């Protein structure tokens, strides 16, 4: 009786999953990706990251080889990592050539002195800091982590990342080889899990990137959604590029033996576009699932949103909940959380709004602070907010300020009665 029960449970779960997929706002997601790609100039950003990546490839590879060379016991991990890079991140048509060039360059770079190695290390860190700034821009984060903290975190990622990744891949290779052919006789579902390791490693890496790099709370389920999006698109892009190069060998005909370089440039650009779009998916997934109805394209939108935030915080000032989280404000105002970030930072800078007692929404997610109204509406002039978000007071605008009475308005005048 357990088998029919298990099948029925699986059928219900599959049906629920298909229902969720059918209700997902695919059209709105595509529109958001198109809008953000154009408005945030992600194509130009991907070009910049492509150039920086080309400069940083050899430094990254040199640091990774230095780590493995310093610990000869990890030689098998190095082979596993190189094999994964060849089969997962680069199209087959150029993978082995690129790996051969990188190994050759890195071997020569390892003979540099301290000054030369420092230059390579700075180049590698420059790429990482560029990624950090780009992702924080997508999440509309105004305040980055301290530079020293970022450098320490990313240095640890550069040195320990290859070891951990190589260890996981080598362990799987060992299981496959030590099984004596048993793995080949396992059920198709288990074999599929082994075959999907490369896909999941890439998805997990992207999820870690989207969860930890932005200096703002990012839920794990949203980060994993972005990671799976990137892994799927990378696989599709690899197959599409391989198909194109096989059917239309333009680069090989024109460039001959040098065709690897332009193909590598095209691939790195495509990969960065996918990674940036994955970040957009992760950042905007909360608003997409919530069905945001207000995009805020009119002039003065930020000022209007600030007034609405003040009204909502004033409404709950005596409630036992002690303020509202950014997600709650976004839901009440039917806007994207990312639109609220600069507004809340402006109100906090004016000391009108404060953060209190971070709340853990889910055990696996970072705590979210609550925002409370600190200013007294009866004695606080609205002029600083008007000056900051709407209209600066200048000599030419003085008559408008005086006749409109903008300098005399108090916060209480714009709050709901």
From Swiss-Prot:
The keyword Membrane applies. Its main location: membrane. It is found in: Cell inner membrane. It is a multi-pass membrane protein. Keywords: Cell inner membrane, Cell membrane, Membrane, Transmembrane, Transmembrane helix. One of its GO terms (cellular component) is plasma membrane. Belongs to the UPF0761 family. This is UPF0761 membrane protein Veis_3782.
